Amino acid sequence: MSEDRSKAYTDAGVDINAGNALVSRIKSIVARTHTNGVISDIGGFGGLFKPDLAGMDEPVLVSSTDGVGTKLKCAFQFGKHDTVGIDLVAMSVNDILVQGARPLFFLDYFATGKLDVDVAASVISGVAEGCRRASCALLGGETAEMPEMYAPGEYDLAGFCVGLVDNTRIVDGSSIRVGDSIIGIASTGLHSNGYSLARKVLAQSGLNGNDPLPGSDRTVAEVLLEPTAIYVDIVRSVMRDFAIKGMVHVTGGGFYDNIPRVLPATVEAHIDFGSWTVPPVFNWLLAQGNLTWPEMLQIFNCGIGYIMIVSPDVCDEVLGRVNAMHAQAWRIGSIGRRRDKAAEQVQVAF
């Protein structure tokens, strides 16, 4: 846009030229995420996607939307913006993965008070990397510059994912039975939940981003900005050869709120807390925040980012498959009969 035509809008705090510069910067990055289903280019009013429905009897679309929450405050504080886009993708694709869906495409929304092209390009590069890890296309997005809506240097993110699953292969937990095995797959850290408390604990500790995290060989900034794991490749590999009865993306609400979402009312989950390795960041939060492990499991993933529930006769094979894909997995519990409907549906043995 010519300077004369855009001057009034620029004077009002919206720099259209900066927006155009951002599109030019990210165009090739976004294009590299495109899969065979993408039939439109960046810059159109809508993204076009033609799904491959071969082999599907009753294709069902599955959608999810999410954000990154106050983990963004850590990005602002530590001046590192290239990984929160991965978090954004992970939060939505892992959610639809729970129902057995294959992610098709992703849309992002980036909002800020004053557009910093370098920062925005760094964020969108992370979104593209997340899409690459999830084998889905970054089909489109929106960049909103809104003066006076955000503090200087801050922004917010939202993401939207659409995936596909055959109706006969939807994973909904209805086939879970007493005796089934619960497999936990390692998280990379806090993922994208519990950061309001984590940041409060950090402020009280007196540590800064460059300090080593107690019990770890990494800095505070590195640990707190470690991106959320994307479990698409692992889960799809397991689904090709084994029946998964139920899955859980361990997000806000931890074990106690998320596991019951996939359990039939007649059963409960028995979790053995000592069955997996808890990363140092959670031990630090426990001690520094003066918390208990039940409180921790209500807030954080505590080292388990994703759960699969399978028949006991395939548990060892599934564990072998996951571990062979350079991820850590453990049998962390089993399904029992629910004897008291007034009690928690997740019972943890500490």
UniProtKB/Swiss-Prot annotation:
Presence of the UniProt keyword Cytoplasm in the record: yes
Any one GO biological process: 'de novo' IMP biosynthetic process
Reaction(s) catalysed by this chain's protein: 2-formamido-N(1)-(5-O-phospho-beta-D-ribosyl)acetamidine + ATP = 5-amino-1-(5-phospho-beta-D-ribosyl)imidazole + ADP + phosphate + H(+)
Pfam families from the UniProt entry: AIRS, AIRS_C
Keywords from the UniProt entry: ATP-binding, Cytoplasm, Ligase, Nucleotide-binding, Purine biosynthesis
Enzyme Commission code: 6.3.3.1
Cross-referenced InterPro entries: PurM-like_C_dom, PurM-like_C_sf, PurM-like_N, PurM-like_N_sf, PurM_cligase
One GO CC term, this protein: cytosol
Top EC class, one word: ligase
Keyword Metal-binding tagged: no
Pathway(s) where this gene product acts: Purine metabolism; IMP biosynthesis via de novo pathway; 5-amino-1-(5-phospho-D-ribosyl)imidazole from N(2)-formyl-N(1)-(5-phospho-D-ribosyl)glycinamide: step 2/2
Gene Ontology molecular function: ATP binding; phosphoribosylamine-glycine ligase activity; phosphoribosylformylglycinamidine cyclo-ligase activity
Main location (coarse class): cytoplasm
Subcellular location: Cytoplasm
Record field: transmembrane: none
Family that this chain belongs to: Belongs to the AIR synthase family.
UniProt-listed HAMAP family: AIRS (MF_00741)
Name of protein: Phosphoribosylformylglycinamidine cyclo-ligase
